[in-house]
């Protein structure tokens, strides 16, 4: 590999990426540019600027961007058009955030003339794959530095020792969670510590976004969600930007103990991993989106969507957001959403999301045909021929078996 002259680092301002920042200079002797993305993680991102400056980064080489609206509009909403769930439970909160970060890393690298990007994902997880597949899809010539796959700082003690020797300030935060956490507007995840035993129940004080369903309000709350062309646009009649829509939905879900999840998932790199997640807004949204689709989609259209969803979810989980196959599936999915518009009413109660009504100007529900009362449009005698034709293969097979 040719000598790297300039690298763009995905920088959080935390211990790990601060160590990486200094390590890149010590080992690659290159200029470092930092990129910090605000995707709704709930922490102030501006302190990352001060930390980078203290570590010797030039002010013009520090990029801090608010990507919350783009994250929801161009990544979360398109994903939910497919009602995407990985392995029957996971709403892909971490997976869907990585393509946007990879995209901006590559774009910034181009704008500043960098020949490489770097990230702080470990060599055991999925994120290394997601970042790097995204980067190579967008720029096949980009170089990627993954320090966790190169260095020997493979313990917390070694990281702290390196930080001290490099003059990196180590902050001791009060009430700091012992878990490894990752958050954005869609969810917050928890891994590590006692969660590494899949049979140990997480402690109640681990959960940060939601009350326990046991302690949620004793009175249900009714809300409405309006959709236009498959995407949410309003809550309780109030039009909201994509990011504000999600902030409000998270608050409603968290208040009622909605969206907690404890699962063991199959990582792309081959191992099983136990994680806990809070996705309050996403849990409500998925229920509502399926409800409005139930009115607006043709039966075969809906069933086709359901059949491709697991593959679509797998592509996102494994890091193939920018792949031609994901984009092809997205085109099909987006086509189905052109008439998915209307309003869904729901009740939120102690961890439950209950659909209580749905309406759409594009509804395919026709009471004249579906009524249980007498009607003048459906001839029930027609069903006999329909059944007979669909039973023909059973009749032929049955006779063949009987004659043996």
Swiss-Prot record:
Q: Which UniProt keywords apply?
A: Amino-acid biosynthesis, Arginine biosynthesis, ATP-binding, Cytoplasm, Ligase, Nucleotide-binding
The residues that the entry says bind L-citrulline are 90, 95, 126, 130, 180, 189, 265, 277
Its pathway?
Answer: Amino-acid biosynthesis; L-arginine biosynthesis; L-arginine from L-ornithine and carbamoyl phosphate: step 2/3
Per the record's keyword annotation, is Disulfide bond included, yes or no?
Answer: no
The keyword Cytoplasm is annotated on this UniProt entry: yes
Per its UniProt record, what NCBIfam families does this chain match? argG, PRK00509.1
Task: Please give the name of this protein.
Answer: Argininosuccinate synthase
Species name for this entry? Answer: Helicobacter hepaticus (strain ATCC 51449 / 3B1)
- Name the gene: argG
């Amino acid at each position: 590999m040719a000598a790297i002259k300039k690298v763009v680092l995905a920088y959080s301002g935390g211990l790990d990426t601060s160590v990486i920042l200094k390590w890149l200079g010590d080992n690659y002797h290159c200029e470092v540019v930092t990129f910090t993305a605000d995707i709704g993680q709930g922490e102030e991102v501006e302190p990352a600027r001060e930390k980078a400056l203290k570590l010797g980064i030039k002010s013009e080489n520090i990029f801090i961007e608010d990507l919350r609206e783009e994250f929801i509009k161009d990544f979360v909403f398109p994903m939910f058009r497919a009602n995407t769930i990985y392995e029957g439970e996971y709403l892909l909160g971490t997976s869907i955030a990585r393509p946007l970060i990879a995209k901006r890393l590559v774009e910034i690298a181009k704008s500043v003339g960098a020949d490489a990007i770097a990230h702080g994902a470990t060599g055991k997880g999925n994120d290394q794959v997601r970042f790097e597949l995204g980067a190579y899809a967008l720029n096949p010539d980009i170089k990627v530095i993954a320090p966790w796959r190169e260095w020997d700082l493979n313990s917390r003690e070694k990281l702290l020792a390196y930080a001290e020797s490099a003059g990196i300030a180590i902050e001791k935060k009060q009430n700091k969670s012992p878990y490894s956490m990752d958050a954005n507007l869609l969810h917050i995840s928890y891994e590590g510590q006692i969660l590494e035993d899949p049979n140990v129940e997480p402690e109640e004080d681990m959960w940060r976004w939601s009350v326990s369903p046991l302690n949620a309000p004793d009175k249900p709350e009714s809300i409405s969600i309006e959709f236009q062309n498959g995407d949410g646009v309003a809550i309780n009649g109030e039009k909201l930007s994509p990011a504000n829509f999600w902030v409000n939905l998270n608050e409603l879900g968290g208040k009622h103990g909605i969206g907690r999840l404890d699962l063991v998932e199959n990582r792309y790199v081959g191992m099983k991993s136990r994680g806990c997640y809070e996705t309050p807004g996403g849990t409500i949204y998925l229920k509502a989106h399926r409800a409005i689709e139930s009115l607006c989609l043709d039966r075969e259209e809906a069933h086709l969507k359901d059949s491709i969803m697991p593959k679509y979810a797998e592509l996102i989980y494994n890091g193939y957001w920018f792949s031609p196959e994901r984009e092809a599936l997205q085109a099909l999915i987006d086509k189905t959403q052109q008439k998915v518009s209307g309003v869904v009413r729901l009740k939120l109660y102690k961890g439950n999301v209950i659909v209580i009504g749905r309406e759409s100007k594009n509804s395919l529900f026709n009471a004249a045909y579906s009524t249980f009362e007498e009607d003048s449009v459906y001839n029930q005698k027609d069903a006999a021929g329909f059944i007979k034709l669909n039973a023909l293969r059973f009749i032929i097979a049955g006779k063949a078996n009987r004659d043996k």
